[in-house]
Amino acid sequence: QGKQYFNENGENVKKAFLRAPLDFAYISSHFNPNRMHPILHKIKAHNGVDYAAKRNTPVKASGDGVISFIGKQRGYGRTIEIKHGGNIKTLYAHLERFNSKLKQGSKVKQGDIIAYVGDSGQATGPHLHFEFWKGEIRTDPVKVKLPSAKPVNISQKDDFDNLLQLNLNKLNQYNLKKNG
């Protein structure tokens, strides 16, 4: 699973979700319940964030989860939905293409490449439309309070505490030698 980093309380310093699941140039459209739609020319809620990026820029899974939808959705074009624990779902739309290894039911980890930026569906140019759902409510991915990743496993907490104390003692000895 790679390296993980924890604070002195055993809490993971990494978040459970990536706020922006790709390398992007700028935000071309913010979360806005009263946005003027650029193609339909009428007020229509924009329930996500549009990250402008070059076509075929890799799109990563924002967090660990299971692909609950992969295919085309009206307006969104090529779309992926991922269900995460805690009643959270993320949506990725206007994609150029999907990672060919993925299908509905595939498990993904945070940072896995799931697709590539495009302009499928009703889009004015290449970008990722990204939504973050809590239950049935869409929230602003830029402003939502993201949960931390899992803390130190309870079965490893004693070992973690012992290692922490050992390293704190070493730091204190070093500081005493340096300043003493």
Q: What kind of feature is each model-predicted range?
A:
Residues 1-5, 161-172:
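Intrinsically disordered, low-complexity regulatory tails and linkers that flank structured modules
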